[in-house]
């Protein structure tokens, strides 16, 4: 019997093989999977977010996938509330919550809580977008560095979504986003969390995996998927969903701002930058099981160590 019910966090950078490992573990573990991915929440964004197929989602219970229209917004605070509700229900069913993804802010918010942040303000965001169109996102990143140096250090100047959010929070609250997050009230999760980190030992290997996956997405019809979103008059680059890595670059290609080769190059580069940020977050994690997806027996390694950790948690 578990003193506190267990929960497994399967974390890793993009293209590390988290979904495949999660499904392999689900074959052996009585669990339900909770997606920790800020883009997989959106309906109609399947190829570019590498969602598991509907057949796999029916075979292995998944949560927090396809819960919003791309015109809607999602937040770390809402994720925390949704995840806690799901984890409680899954544990009551006698199963283990298996949280899988690469949105590290969501994992952090779930673990430590988060200061109440203001909801997105369309007028403020539109004003920031107009300023970015005139001055460029690099200029706005420089302004962010003056207002919130800590946030600017963590946010790359090619990450307009996070630059916009940090500036928006400052305009709405008068306080830096980094300060609000740092002051978030730590609240211990009522779970025995087992952390599993999946990442190649060599960054060059991850870079290669990222490029292969994006080119496979293109062959699978990614541009056609984005065209379907592009044709909707209610969607634009002002929406968080469309600013997701890969989608933003494809959108600009459809607006004739990029050539096809440039679009692919920019998308791959942006994905590598995202992976770099994810790895920075992961380096802060302690007491985690580390697995290299390039090892032939990495599934067995992960299972053996996870099984041992679950025994110790009981």
UniProtKB/Swiss-Prot annotation:
Residues that coordinate or bind ATP: 12-19
UniProt site positions, description: Interaction with substrate tRNA: 103, 125
Alphabetical list of InterPro entries matching this protein: Dimethylallyltransferase (IPR039657), IPT (IPR018022), P-loop_NTPase (IPR027417)
Pfam families in alphabetical order: IPPT
Gene3D superfamilies registered for this protein in UniProt: 1.10.20.140, P-loop containing nucleotide triphosphate hydrolases
Molecular function, one GO term: tRNA dimethylallyltransferase activity
Domain of life: Bacteria
Subunit structure, as described in the record: Monomer.
General function of this protein: Catalyzes the transfer of a dimethylallyl group onto the adenine at position 37 in tRNAs that read codons beginning with uridine, leading to the formation of N6-(dimethylallyl)adenosine (i(6)A).
Protein name from the UniProt record: tRNA dimethylallyltransferase
Species assigned in the record: Nitrosococcus oceani (strain ATCC 19707 / BCRC 17464 / JCM 30415 / NCIMB 11848 / C-107)
């Amino acid at each position: 019997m578990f003193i506190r019910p267990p929960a497994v966090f399967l974390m890793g950078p993009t293209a590390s093989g988290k979904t495949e490992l999660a499904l392999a573990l689900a074959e052996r573990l009585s669990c339900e999977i909770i997606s920790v991915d800020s883009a997989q929440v959106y309906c109609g964004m399947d190829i570019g977010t590498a969602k598991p197929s509907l057949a796999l989602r029916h075979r292995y219970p998944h949560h927090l996938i396809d819960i919003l229209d791309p015109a809607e917004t999602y937040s770390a605070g809402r994720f925390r509330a949704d995840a806690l509700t799901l984890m409680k229900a899954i544990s009551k069913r006698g199963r283990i919550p298996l949280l899988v993804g690469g949105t590290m802010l969501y994992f952090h918010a779930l673990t430590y809580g988060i200061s109440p942040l203001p909801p997105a303000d369309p007028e403020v965001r539109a004003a920031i977008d107009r300023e970015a169109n005139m001055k460029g996102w690099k200029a706005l990143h420089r302004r962010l560095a003056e207002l919130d140096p800590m946030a600017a250090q963590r946010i790359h100047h090619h990450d307009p979504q996070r630059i916009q959010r940090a500036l928006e929070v400052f305009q709405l609250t008068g306080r830096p986003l980094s300060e609000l997050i740092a002051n978030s009230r730590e609240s211990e999760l009522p779970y025995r969390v087992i952390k599993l980190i999946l990442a190649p030992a060599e960054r060059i290997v991850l870079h290669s995996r990222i490029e292969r996956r994006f080119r496979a997405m293109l062959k699978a019809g990614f541009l056609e998927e984005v065209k379907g979103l592009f044709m909707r008059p209610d969607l634009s680059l002002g929406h968080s969903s469309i600013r997701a890595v890969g989608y933003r670059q494809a959108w600009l290609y459809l607006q004739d701002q990029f050539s096809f080769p440039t679009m692919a190059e920019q998308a791959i580069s942006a994905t590598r930058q995202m992976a770099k940020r994810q790895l920075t977050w992961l380096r802060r994690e302690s007491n985690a099981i580390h697995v290299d997806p390039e090892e032939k027996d990495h599934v067995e390694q992960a299972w053996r160590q996870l099984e041992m950790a679950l025994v110790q948690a009981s």
